[in-house]
């Protein structure tokens, strides 16, 4: 298990609070696999824009990169806007991790399910993340069933 350097004894909620209240930003003190799950639950499931923005700043490098079969975006605002588009295209859908994430040497992957809460496996896939200095530097999303699968037709592109 790789531990990301940060403030000893910090928890995710306190880090989010520090970012919201004081603008502080430090690397997380959690194992990378736990951050992969938190990425789904605290960022991609979060409907509150302020909390999501704080979580993005807590978990992603400022110059991060995100790519799926539909588009690629850069930076915190790019990730934030991508999640907004996902929520607009699929109201009420949620992500759930499918089993534990695995990680080594700054690379991690997390299988997931996405859909209505009562049928959360409507769309499945895997996130692959590259970590640098304790933050997600790049996140690549692969949707089961081929490039973009059926989601590509329903997930609007940016700009």
Feature-to-residue mapping (PLM):
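Short, low-complexity N-terminal intrinsically disordered segments enriched in polar/charged residues
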Residues: 13-62
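A beta-strand edge to alpha-helix "cap/lid" segment located at domain peripheries
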Residues: 19-31, 87-159
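Residues that form generic nucleotide/phosphate-binding pockets
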Residues: 39, 43, 82, 86, ...
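Hydrophobic alpha-helical context, especially transmembrane and signal-peptide helices
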Residues: 1-2, 66
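Acidic, Ala/Val/Gly-enriched low-complexity intrinsically disordered segments
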Residues: 2, 6-18
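A solvent-exposed, acidic/Ser-Thr-rich amphipathic alpha-helical stretch
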Residues: 50-106
